[in-house]
Amino acid sequence: MTISLGFVVAEFNRDLTYQMELLGREHAEFLGATVKETILVPGVFDMPLAIKKLCQRDDIDAVVTIGSVIEGDTDHDQVVMQHAARKIMDLSLEFNKPVTLGIPGPGMTRMAAHERVDYAKRAVEAAVKLVRRL
């Protein structure tokens, strides 16, 4: 059985999320999974609706989120990440489908974000493992 993945990718910090998306696609192929659809959203906070759309599809086995939440001058990064992570988990439980978190942050500098682009690979691997094990 080939595992079909949906990607939800944030455009904010696109220099990072583009690299992450490419790594995620390569790793999916390495694991024998297929990225069936990719939805680009403005930012991490905007992901839940796109995740829900993919979770509703019978031809998607799991959803991988890809984004990067970088620290700013306010606590905005904390708020964005906390709410997004909570909703992402809720959608996984609501649809009984793996939704994995490939979003490093919050409290992270841009340099630290560059060092964490491999989070996309981790999220793809988690999605594939969950589909196989559940």
Curated annotation (Swiss-Prot):
Keywords: Riboflavin biosynthesis, Transferase. (2S)-2-hydroxy-3-oxobutyl phosphate binds at residues 73-74, 116. The lineage of its organism: Archaea, Methanobacteriati, Methanobacteriota, Stenosarchaea group, Methanomicrobia. Pathway: Cofactor biosynthesis; riboflavin biosynthesis; riboflavin from 2-hydroxy-3-oxobutyl phosphate and 5-amino-6-(D-ribitylamino)uracil: step 1/2. 5-amino-6-(D-ribitylamino)uracil binds at residues 12, 44-46, 68-70, 101. It is an enzyme of class 2 (transferase). PANTHER family: 6,7-DIMETHYL-8-RIBITYLLUMAZINE SYNTHASE, 6,7-DIMETHYL-8-RIBITYLLUMAZINE SYNTHASE DMRL SYNTHASE LUMAZINE SYNTHASE. The active site is at residue 76. GO terms for biological process: riboflavin biosynthetic process. This is 6,7-dimethyl-8-ribityllumazine synthase. InterPro entries: LS, LS/RS, LS/RS_sf. It catalyses: (2S)-2-hydroxy-3-oxobutyl phosphate + 5-amino-6-(D-ribitylamino)uracil = 6,7-dimethyl-8-(1-D-ribityl)lumazine + phosphate + 2 H2O + H(+). Belongs to the DMRL synthase family. Catalyzes the formation of 6,7-dimethyl-8-ribityllumazine by condensation of 5-amino-6-(D-ribitylamino)uracil with 3,4-dihydroxy-2-butanone 4-phosphate. This is the penultimate step in the biosynthesis of riboflavin. One of its GO terms (molecular function) is 6,7-dimethyl-8-ribityllumazine synthase activity. One of its GO terms (cellular component) is riboflavin synthase complex. Its EC number is 2.5.1.78.
